[in-house]
Amino acid sequence: WMKISITVGLVLVLLLSLFIKNKERAIKIGLCLSLCQQFILYSWYIGTGYHLATEGLPLFHCRICMLGLAFAYFAKKEKLVNYFAILGLICGSMACIVVDLDHFVFPHWTNFSYIVGHYLLVFNAFMLVRERSKIQVKDIISITLIMNLFILVADLSLKANYGFLMKLPSSLSFVPLTGVSVGVFISLLMILVLAILNKVLPYNKVLLEDKEEYIKA
């Protein structure tokens, strides 16, 4: 019942975002709440020392999106906002459908944080996706490869599995890959999915720098 309830909550979050009138204010509040949630979560990991190196760092794609969206939005890095909005919507939704809670009796803080954090990510990402600019495939490729290379180096150094770049989740256990090859597979899959969604999802404008490139071409 817990997993079903979380999925139903995901649908309600998406519906709620459709009826908000003051979008800019809602996005700012949502991003600030997301930062607070992340701060409390990392404070808990640091305070308890529970799997700090292998699970407590902001190296999962969802956590990167949570922090990346806030930084990019407030720093007015439009290209990164558009990238993390699409990635955050995908990752956040998947996390609410294929639920992977920590092994603590609910309601433990980590599990509560998991639910709230991903709801906020989906809310923020969905709000921003609807106002997004179209980005170029080369940017999707470069950002994804740089991000995943950094995660993969951390995984190898810490013997962790951030981003599932060393070992696939159980739902993809049928894929005969292990080690670094998993990271390559996930990276290619991410690039493909992000490129497709970037093309098919509606967008309001084109980045100014992209306009200039089109004019020069």
Language model: regions and residue ranges:
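Cytoplasmic-side transmembrane-helix entry/capping segments in multi-pass membrane proteins
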Residues: 27-31, 56-59, 81-89, 111
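A contiguous pocket-lining binding segment that forms or flanks enzyme active sites
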Residues: 97-142
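Hydrophobic cores of alpha-helical transmembrane segments in multi-pass inner/ER membrane proteins
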Residues: 5-15, 63-74, 117-130, 180-199
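Aromatic-anchored segments of alpha-helical transmembrane domains
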Residues: 34-44, 88-100, 144-156
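Membrane-interface transmembrane-helix boundary segments in multi-pass integral membrane proteins
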Residues: 1-8, 137-146, 156-195
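Structural signature of hydrophobic alpha-helical transmembrane segments
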Residues: 2-7, 50-62, 83-85
